[in-house]
Design a protein with these regions (language model features):
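Conserved alpha/beta enzyme-core scaffold
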Residues: 1-436
Length: 436
């Protein structure tokens, strides 16, 4: 590399070791950590290793893919974690009251960080700079770029393995105060196991997808199962908060072309990525993939500019009126809203759009119905009954849009697990004793 020029001088003068970089963080400060697979693990490890020098550092994060060691009890006086989403490494600490949870739509996190929770420091991971001094945020643009732009200090792990994604995904090195070179593997998310139930759900969902539709897919076995049954479709598009390896397969098969899109034609649009090296190799320097901050990608009014936008999400529980719970089990917080509501609303604004909730009919090894007469006490409604168009299980499709409460209940009971239909029907008869 030619190290001549102003930005190159900046780069050399702002190179730090991980230990040196975290020395710039002070007690009482607010630190935002890049999202999901963009998490700079080497910097977080250094932060925790130097925990003794900190007191009450607030750490804001969404999906934590690493160990989230800062949540461990021995660091309660050093770090305070404020989560926008709970996962496997943070859920138990939240249940014990050692982690705070802040409910917020994914699309609104950037404005929250600019106005209400302005960070002192942002920790992120990026690609090496190009000839002009720009680094790409790679797999995590979402709230990471807005946080960096709002922060007093940015500490970045510069990683040769981070794919250089295109779009509005760049920072200039002169926006970064501490640069830490470390070529660690980018965090990967292995493809989920898809069982018979997920396959049946995927086939039912795919039956509602038409040639030329634009898709939003969530994370997990059900979205991946849907992709298995789209191989006979044509000219599908992608406008989604995230995608994984399954999308790459459909691109290579010629199913996803983005040719019919009415916004960003020819490009798959996302705000973060979770997958394996196959995905990361595909998106690297690929102009067919455009990454933008989440306040753009997940803006319902932007989403709605895509005709025939099909949002496909999953949930924890649905009552027989069509109210959806996706983030809690009673009073126990288990995840976060993410982009579900953003895309449900966007699908409803889209010409020809469809908002789909897809889930197994039961949980707890088949002992608990996910379609219920009443939501569990304390559960927070994620998506209202006014916004869901379809609910899908392995037993079929319930169309709710335009249906009365009576008709919704009848449709949802039909797709419930057979073991629970009598119980649901009894409640239905109590509410609606008169036949029409």
């Amino acid at each position: 590399m030619d190290w001549c020029g102003p930005w190159r001088t900046w780069y050399k003068e702002h190179l730090f070791t991980p230990a040196q970089a975290v020395q710039q963080i002070k007690s009482g400060q607010r630190v935002v950590v890049a999202h999901a697979c963009g998490e700079p693990s080497i910097i977080l490890d250094a932060l925790v290793a130097h925990a003794a020098q900190y007191e009450n550092v607030e750490i804001i994060h969404m999906v934590a893919m690493g160990k989230a060691a800062y949540c461990q009890p021995q660091y309660d006086k050093n770090f305070h974690h404020n989560a926008f989403f709970l996962g496997g490494s943070t859920r138990a600490a939240a249940a014990e009251g050692r982690v705070d949870f802040t409910p917020v739509y994914f699309s609104e996190i950037p404005s929250l960080l600019r106005e209400d929770l302005r960070p002192n420091v942002t920790l992120l991971q990026c690609s090496p700079p190009d000839a002009h001094g720009y680094v790409s945020l790679g797999v995590s643009v979402d709230y990471t770029k807005p946080a960096a732009e709002a922060s007093d200090l940015v500490i970045a792990q510069v990683n040769q393995n981070m794919p250089r994604t295109l779009g509005d995904s760049f920072l200039h090195v002169t926006q970064i105060g501490c640069l830490v070179e470390a070529d660690t593997p980018v965090i990967e998310l292995a493809p989920p196991k898809i069982g018979d139930v997920e396959r049946a759900i995927g086939e039912n969902v795919a039956s509602l997808v038409r040639d030329g539709d634009t898709l939003q897919l969530g994370i997990g076995a059900i979205p991946d199962a849907v992709l298995l049954f789209l191989k006979e479709k044509n000219d599908l598009g992608i406008h989604t908060e995230m995608f994984s390896d399954g999308v790459v397969e459909l691109v290579e098969a010629g199913v996803i072309t983005n040719k019919a899109k009415t916004l960003h034609r020819g490009q798959s649009v996302a705000t973060f990525l979770m997958g394996t090296c196959r995905l990361y190799d595909y998106v690297n320097n690929n102009p067919a993939v455009a990454m933008y901050p989440v306040d753009y990608v997940n803006d319902p009014y932007v989403i709605g500019q895509n005709d025939n936008l099909v949002s496909i999400n999953s949930c924890v529980q649905v009552d027989i009126m069509g109210q959806v719970v996706s983030t809690s089990a009673g009073l126990r917080q288990i995840s976060g809203v993410g982009g579900q509501v953003d895309f449900v609303r966007g699908a409803n604004l889209s010409k020809g759009g469809r908002a789909i909730m897809a889930m197994p009919s039961t949980t707890g090894k088949g002992k608990i119905s996910k379609i219920v007469p009443f939501l569990d006490q304390g559960s927070a409604v994620t998506t209202t009954r006014n916004e869901v168009n379809y609910v899908i299980t392995e037993y079929g499709i319930a169309k709710l849009k335009g249906k009365s409460l009576r008709q919704r209940a009848e449709a949802l009971i039909r797709i419930a697990h057979p073991d629970f239909r009598d119980e649901l029907t009894a409640e239905f008869r109590r509410r609606y004793p008169r036949d029409y």
